[in-house]
Amino acid sequence: MTETAKRPLYVPHAGPSLLEMPLLNKGSAFSTQERIDFNLQGLLPHNIETIEEQTERAYSQYNLCNTDLDRHIFLRSIQDNNETLFFRLLEEHLEEMMPIIYTPTVGQACQEFSKIYRTHRGLFISYPDRERIDDILRSATKNNVKIVVVTDSERILGLGDQGIGGMGIPIGKLSLYTACGGISPAYTLPVVLDVGTNNPDLLNDPMYMGWRHERVSGAQYEEFVDLFIQAIKRRWPNVLLQFEDFAQTNAMPLLERYKDELCCFNDDIQGTAAVAVGTLLAACKAKGEKLSEQTVTFVGAGSAGCGIAEQIIAAMQLEGLDEAQARRRIFMVDRWGLLTDDMSNLLDFQHRLAQKRADLGAWGGQQGDDLALLEVIRNARPTVLIGVSGQRGLFSEEVIRELHSHCKQPLVMPLSNPTSRVEATPQEILNWTDGQALVATGSPFQPVQVGDKRIPIAQCNNAYIFPGIGLGVIAVRANRVTEGMLMAAANALANCSPIVTQGEGAVLPALGDIREVSKRIAVAVAKQAQAEGKALHTSDEVLNDAIEANFWFPRYRAYRRTSF
């Protein structure tokens, strides 16, 4: 416990209003003296409980829920009533509850957002209110915001346009910043930019709570986002802004436009890339190989897939390859087949990842020929297969067996979310490779039994990366998030892998260890920020103390009454 946590907190609120503040409410844990000082006598049952007793009751209530969506709603209701209790409950049951508060259950919660809505959380900034964004930000109840997660809800997981229902993603992401990275919930703010929706189900739903209008696009959209960014810079100039679940047509341009203007990153592009590269590095270390020796095939060439590919290329260059050599080891397969330089429909960020058809030799065919996934596997002979397509079943038995025929221990990463969109299940992949493949998935899966072996499945979850990035940025007050910082995070994650540290187990650490993993990532990120001049340099001792000081634990502090 830090010295700050031991000191009393001076609180100017009292009575029912105090009980209605999730960041301050202790419920039945208010002491006798606090009940007197804060005019709470008679507003709570007589018995005074510890947080351990409250957590036990909450968990027993949680177990009465019948469905995962019911469990999600229950946990969110606790969060909206008592954040300390919510995060204590998560701390004690993180592996069990993480799939409930985030993927895959959060996908359904986003789809049902208007139907299950209970109370406000975060900010809803709609296009019709674009001239009042400064006023909206000033109305936020949190003054010392250090991390904002913002979405426009156009590409929620693999579910597409969910309108304001996408707010479930920033809420869930920030819950993980706290549960996994120790970021105080007092420092976090979820935001949804309501620019309308093109989802006809929502437009025709009488219960839909968002702006009932087709999506704003083009120059109007860009102007609106810029109004938001500039207002954020005025309100919280040192904030870390995370872009979340923007469509690929906007995600990369927004990142490129603002990455040198404020401290920001896109988790779908850069966070996904960092955890994927960390997974690859761990697998390579375990096999005694180099990343630069691998050949990687992607299924899905959107912004997430291309972001991963670019970071792999950068990592290969750090191992000695030149850029051209590294790019020749990356094969991007999309709905039209392998991306090649003679295609006329490539997006801007895809051009640099397209293979030169002339370099493919006989199997490259003629200009205009589509090269399907199986053909790419058969001829490129990859050692790594990554799925970010959102299409169930694309990793067929024929594809996986072909992959295994030339690579004894391939790394297969079906990363699409939610579970219903995964390219292949771990059970299928391991059955088709005689239990030899290394598997990491985007959604959580139970261990797989293959013969007499029980094989744990690593969830290639961005939660291994972004909480540590946030903690490191906050600890040293970094003013930017750089590619070097993301690479430092990936390397730190790889060094925590059980198959690296113990020679067996999953490719990634157990979720139960994620808070310690986040601290190690925070140290690596902070040191890299200092090395690049993005933060003031300190000694290692001062840096470690700063990380510990910023690491919040869900414990109640004693309260003292004060006036405004």
From Swiss-Prot:
Positions with a binding annotation for a divalent metal cation: 244-245, 268
Active site: 102, 173
SUPFAM superfamilies hit by this protein: Aminoacid dehydrogenase-like, N-terminal domain (SSF53223), NAD(P)-binding Rossmann-fold domains (SSF51735)
Example of a GO biological process term: malate metabolic process
PROSITE patterns assigned to the protein according to its UniProt record, in alphabetical order: MALIC_ENZYMES
Disulfide bonds: none
Reactions it catalyzes: (S)-malate + NAD(+) = pyruvate + CO2 + NADH; oxaloacetate + H(+) = pyruvate + CO2
Site (Important for activity) residue list: 268
GO CC annotation terms, alphabetical: cytosol
Requisite cofactors: Mg(2+); Mn(2+)
Amino acids binding NAD(+): 155, 268, 417
Positions in coiled-coil regions: none
EC number in record: 1.1.1.38
Short name of any one Pfam family annotated for the protein: Malic_M
Cofactor remark from the record: Divalent metal cations. Prefers magnesium or manganese.
GO function term, MF aspect, one: metal ion binding
The entry's keywords: Metal-binding, NAD, Oxidoreductase
Family recorded in the similarity comment: Belongs to the malic enzymes family.
Subunit details: Homotetramer.
Name of the molecule in the record: NAD-dependent malic enzyme
